[in-house]
C-alpha cells in the first residue's frame, strides 16, 4: 500500500461524539505505524428553521431551531496493511457518519 492515502471524512450533530471518534481513529492509525495528518476541522453547517407558535394569528410569536453538522477530515499517509485491517475492525459511535476514500 505504498504511495497511497486514505482520506476519512466524519460528520455528526454532536461535537463530542465526532471528537471522540477522531481521537480513536488517529490513535489506531498511529499505533499501527501510519503517518496521520489531521484531524482537520471543516466548517460547521448551520441549518435554521423558523416556526410559528400560534396556530392562527400573531405572526410575531415564533420559535427558531438550529441543527449544526460538525465535520472533520483525517488523512492517513502511507498506510500499512495492519492500518487498514485495524480501521476496518474499528467500532465507532452510532451518530457518526464515516466516508472513506482511497487516493
UniProtKB/Swiss-Prot annotation:
GO process annotations (BP): translation
InterPro entries in the cross-refs: Ribosomal_uS10, Ribosomal_uS10_CS, Ribosomal_uS10_dom, Ribosomal_uS10_dom_sf
Alphabetic keyword roster: Ribonucleoprotein, Ribosomal protein
Species the sequence originates in: Vibrio cholerae serotype O1 (strain ATCC 39541 / Classical Ogawa 395 / O395)
Family designation: Belongs to the universal ribosomal protein uS10 family.
Superkingdom classification of source: Bacteria
GO cellular component, one term: ribosome
Described function: Involved in the binding of tRNA to the ribosomes.
Cited Pfam families: Ribosomal_S10 (PF00338)
Xref: PROSITE patterns: RIBOSOMAL_S10
Self-association and partners: Part of the 30S ribosomal subunit.
Protein name: Small ribosomal subunit protein uS10
Gene name linked to the record: rpsJ
Molecular functions (GO terms): structural constituent of ribosome; tRNA binding
Amino acid at each position: 500500500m505504498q504511495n497511497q492515502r486514505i482520506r476519512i471524512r466524519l460528520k455528526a450533530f454532536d461535537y463530542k461524539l465526532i471528537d471522540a471518534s477522531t481521537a480513536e481513529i488517529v490513535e489506531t492509525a498511529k499505533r499501527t505505524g501510519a503517518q496521520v495528518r489531521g484531524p482537520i476541522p471543516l466548517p460547521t453547517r448551520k441549518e435554521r428553521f423558523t416556526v410559528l407558535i400560534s396556530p392562527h394569528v400573531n405572526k410575531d410569536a415564533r420559535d427558531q431551531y438550529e441543527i449544526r453538522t460538525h465535520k472533520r477530515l483525517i488523512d492517513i499517509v502511507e498506510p500499512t496493511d495492519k492500518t487498514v485491517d485495524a480501521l476496518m475492525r474499528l467500532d465507532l459511535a452510532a451518530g457518526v457518519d464515516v466516508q472513506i476514500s482511497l487516493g
